[in-house]
Amino acid sequence: MAAASYEARAYGVYSATPSRTAQYKCPHLIFVPPRFDVYKAVAAQIREIFDRYSDLVEPVALDEAYLDVTENKLNIVSAQAIAQAIRSEIFKATQLTASAGVLGNKFLAKMASGLNKPNGMSLILPHEGLDFVAQLPIEKFHGIGKVTAVKFHEMGIFTGADLRERSVSELVARFGKVGRFYYQIARGEDDRLVVANRVRKSVSVETSYDPDLNDRVRIESALDRVAIDLHRRLEQVGMSGQTLILKVKFADYSQVTRSVTQSMGFMGVRRIQDSSQQLLCALDLEGRSVRLLGLGIGKLMNEEQDFHQLRLEV
């Protein structure tokens, strides 16, 4: 068995259960052959949704990933709101439910994501992290398998609270280098960063408006603010680029994109603003209401590359 539905799990059937055993436990079990092509296609859809919200997406499996939304593409302040929006988009695009854990580090987020499966979201505030970890059975800790759990039990460690009572030296002596990690997670600490395993191809920001913008002056003013947001984001990631992309979505959900490329790149906020306004000026907005404005930079290069390029051209 590669996987089992929640209905099958009620009969004691889980992934890795031998088929004969599974059928014995649940005689009316329905076996479905795998469709890896469909699985990969849906996973790609989900990944596209993740990428709309953050450049920092670290896939763990085809259907699972860590996202760092501290600086997200849509400038949404609430991580909980982002998680809910992503779950809604996934269901709308695939008719599949998704679970999410909203916390400040990878370990806690992974643990929380399993609390309300198959279709829920868990939010644990920073001051709640220690209590959450303390009550967890040690075998429920992400990264601790059956064999390691037995070793912990032999030491009299059955919960996160038990683990927290042990010193780092004791844990390192028993488990080696990973003992230090066990010491940290018992305290709800995990300093691992979310690492995207893809080369960044663009940096973008966008803003939605409610009510819609239907006055050209307001649209131009709003676009200038989006340009400021894009410049700020470029500074955060230490990048600039040679292609500027404008995205405009209208009230009827139709959208247009326009782009311009400059060999010198778009390094200053004024250059981004001027070029984006030129792109906007070429659009016919008469009688149309704007619901969303977006700007992006492609053909990226880091600041050091920019510096050397400019010096050579001089």
Stretches found by the model and what they are:
Residues M1-A4, L108-N116, E154, V194-N197:
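Short acidic, glycine/serine/threonine-rich loops at helix termini
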Residues A65-E71, T257-Q262:
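Short, hydrophobic beta-strand segments
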Residues V77-P137:
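Long, highly charged, low-complexity intrinsically disordered interaction regions
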Residues K140, T148-L292, L300-V314:
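DNA-contacting surface of Y-family translesion DNA polymerases
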